[in-house]
A protein has these predicted regions:
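Cytoplasmic-side transmembrane-helix entry/capping segments in multi-pass membrane proteins
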Residues: 83, 135-148, 204-211, 270, ...
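Alpha-helical transmembrane segments of multi-pass secondary-active solute transporters
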Residues: 50-51, 80, 138, 172-176, ...
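12-transmembrane solute porter fold
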Residues: 12-27, 32-34, 237, 260-467
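Intrinsic disorder in cytosolic terminal tails and internal cytosolic loops
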Residues: 1-10, 197-203, 460-467
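Membrane-helix interface/capping residues of multi-pass secondary transporters
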Residues: 47, 77, 101, 132, ...
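Hydrophobic transmembrane-helix bundles of small-molecule transporters
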Residues: 162-279, 305, 313, 446-447
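Transmembrane-helix bundle of Major Facilitator Superfamily
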Residues: 1-190, 355, 425, 429
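Transmembrane-helix signature of multi-pass solute transporters
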Residues: 87-97, 110, 114, 180-187, ...
Length: 467
């Protein structure tokens, strides 16, 4: 079937609805960054409150991915999708109307829960609706959407804060989701595929509550010390990391013993495409997410850029990621993991060039000097995210697509949280040497993470050629 035929048909319309939802939830990962100074002034917020505005979303997002993916597989992805849209829209309105930091933090936690409900359904629906090269192209479109939403967040947030002013602008950063959510609901009800009753008749077993509890506790213990690194003083917080490993080991033991309907099919990790793809996603997201955090902070706080100008400066990355993701979705069926390795190499080249540009052109012209290097890094990113997701899920049966995607996305969220914490620690500890030096030291951390992802891709290629 020609690509144009399914794009214009029911599956194309359903994919469009899924992509809009993915854009909305991805946008809220980064759009808040440029609004933090306005939130601090408007709600008289302390640093720990601002940190929870960012990290609370990431925490509940990561906690819900696997259980929601499993529930969508077993019940109805369409139903979970629609409930996720409802909750995300209501939580966004609550964020926009928040009268103090406690209300904003709780609303952001709910917003993250809704995003965690939504995103596995998007991947699961793509697994359900598409096969072969069509699936690769659909994941290419999803990768472009994720890349653009994350990279465009600072630009859109900066435009809203600038356009509506510091007092109201930060509220519109959240309220912008209201019209999107209201438009999505009737469209989702109309175009998303309904589950086949015959297919679901034998899939209403237990949802493995013990597995849900163990995985949630393990992920929370692993994430908390990283996202609260600067607010939770002392070294005691790091005791949660070995505690998390013990809990997760208990989760694995339980899943192996639980024969009815385990939360995660551990046999997936015996497939090299899935295990290495998940590792690549974890380390790449640890590297690529931190660039938005450190660069916008450097531009706004170090060089006095306006929120809008800071957002514009990161736009080349978004443009490169969007264009390359579409191409990557078309090529992944032929090039496979070679495409991912090439993309990671291009990202490393782009980040090295960005580091050189900040050294050669210090001062207020940094935004212009880094435009081309960030465009190059964005092109590389577009060849990594969607092709890697398509390859990682290529051997997953459609019936388990939601839970498998939930595990993959949990790794992405975990990588993002660890990466931001690591780069933030190096960045802030280097500030006495100046903003440019702190930014370059932070980039070294990001380059290390991306390089580890490249090693994993290279190992997969070597194993493939030896077969």
């Amino acid at each position: 079937m020609k690509a144009s035929s399914w794009r214009a048909g029911p599956r194309g319309r359903a994919l469009a609805v899924c992509l809009v939802a993915a854009f909305m939830t991805g946008l809220d990962v980064s759009i808040v960054n440029v609004a933090l100074p306005s939130i601090r002034e408007g709600l008289h917020a302390m640093e720990d409150g601002l940190q929870w505005t960012l990290s609370g979303y990431a925490l509940t997002f990561g906690l819900l991915l696997v259980p929601a993916g499993r529930l969508g597989d077993a019940r109805s992805r369409r139903t979970l999708f629609m409930w996720g849209v409802v909750l995300f829209t209501l939580a966004s309105v609550a964020c926009g109307l928040a009268w103090n930091m406690n209300v904003l933090i709780v609303s952001r936690l709910l917003q993250g829960m809704a995003a965690g409900m939504l995103n596995p359904q998007v991947s699961g629906l793509i697994q359900q609706m598409f096969r072969g090269h069509e699936r690769g192209r659909a994941f290419g479109a999803l990768g472009a959407t994720i890349g653009v939403s994350t990279a465009a967040g600072p630009l859109i947030g900066g435009a809203l804060v600038t356009g509506f002013g510091p007092e109201l602008g930060w509220r519109w950063v959240f309220l912008v989701n209201l019209p999107i959510g209201l438009a999505l609901l009737p469209l989702a009800h109309r175009v998303l595929p309904t589950p086949d009753p015959a297919q679901l008749s034998g899939r209403r077993e237990s949802m493995d509550p013990v597995g849900v509890l163990l995985l949630g506790l393990g992920v929370a213990c692993l994430l908390l010390p990283f996202i609260q690194q600067h607010q939770w003083h002392g070294q005691a917080k790091w005791l949660l990391v070995p505690a998390a490993l013990i809990v997760l080991a208990g989760f694995v033991a339980w899943e192996r013993a639980y024969r009815r309907e385990p939360l995660i099919n551990l046999a997936l990790f015996r497939k090299r495409s899935y295990s290495l793809g998940s590792a690549i996603a974890l380390f790449y997201f640890a590297g690529f997410t931190g660039i938005f955090f450190t660069f916008t902070l450097y531009l706004q706080s170090g060089l006095d850029y306006s929120p809008l100008m800071a957002g514009l400066s990161i736009t080349p990355f978004a443009l490169g990621a969007a264009s390359a993701s579409v191409v990557g979705g078309r090529l992944v069926g032929r090039a496979g993991r070679r495409l991912v390795a090439a993309g990671l190499t291009i990202v490393i080249v782009g980040l090295c060039a960005t580091m050189a540009a900040t050294a050669l052109v210090p001062g207020h012209d940094v935004g212009l000097a880094t435009a081309l290097p960030l465009l190059i890094a964005g092109v590389g990113s577009g060849l990594v995210i969607s092709p890697n997701q398509a390859i990682t899920l290529s051997e997953v049966p459609p019936a388990g697509g939601g839970s498998a995607a939930g595990v993959l996305q949990t790794g992405q969220r975990l990588g993002s949280s660890i990466g931001i914490a690591a780069v933030g620690s190096i960045f802030f500890s280097s500030l006495p040497q100046g903003w440019p030096t702190a930014f370059r030291h932070g980039l070294l951390v990001l380059l290390t993470c991306v390089s580890i992802a490249l090693l994993a891709a290279g190992y997969d290629l070597i194993r493939t050629y030896r077969r």
